[in-house]
């Protein structure tokens, strides 16, 4: 832990905490200050002027990033339809299960996957296990495209690399835009798409400054402030 702490302190010295960096410079600095031995994730964090207790100020969804997110995502599809089971397997789903198999997986706590995609008919069953799936971030939701009559298409999009976004109770949105191994231009394109999406989704009831703060960081690196246009 002491070694990690020392590396983080060294990385922080490269960042002026009072400076707001242009987006491309912030991306380059996030990569430079990543000291992890693995291929670190690069994340954006928005602090938004939202009161998420109000239904018209809740923000949640997903977008397809132009260069993917660099992450290998294991997808489980839940459907009783033989046709959808077949097409989902062909689309690249890692696991395809029916109603009974789904319940068995949840009961046995065998969560060897990152995302559940369900056809709408499976939701009554999944709803019973909301307290188990919710905290793990596995509960399917129509807003993120994981509850759909076309799970095969959802699998293709997820495998390409989607960015999920959701404002927490403080109005903070964290979202993955890629990996350290990706080029600066790829991360820049992905970041621009996400930023434009968040801007476009500003609720009409919000007055004043919408994006209060925007930062970027690697998995184990310091936060870097981004200059907003």
Swiss-Prot record:
Alphabetized Pfam families for the sequence: Ribosomal_L1 (PF00687)
InterPro entries hit by this protein: Ribosom_uL1_bac-type, Ribosomal_uL1, Ribosomal_uL1-like, Ribosomal_uL1/biogenesis, Ribosomal_uL1_3-a/b-sand, Ribosomal_uL1_CS
Sorted UniProt keywords: Repressor, Ribonucleoprotein, Ribosomal protein, RNA-binding, rRNA-binding, Translation regulation, tRNA-binding
MF terms (GO), sorted A to Z: rRNA binding; structural constituent of ribosome; tRNA binding
GO cellular component terms attached to this protein's record: large ribosomal subunit
One GO biological process term: translation
SUPFAM superfamilies membership: Ribosomal protein L1
Family note: Belongs to the universal ribosomal protein uL1 family.
Assembly behavior: Part of the 50S ribosomal subunit.
PANTHER family in the cross-refs: 54S RIBOSOMAL PROTEIN L1, MITOCHONDRIAL, LARGE RIBOSOMAL SUBUNIT PROTEIN UL1M
NCBIfam families: rplA_bact
Function: Binds directly to 23S rRNA. The L1 stalk is quite mobile in the ribosome, and is involved in E site tRNA release. Protein L1 is also a translational repressor protein, it controls the translation of the L11 operon by binding to its mRNA.
UniProt name for this protein: Large ribosomal subunit protein uL1
Organism: Mycoplasmopsis pulmonis (strain UAB CTIP)
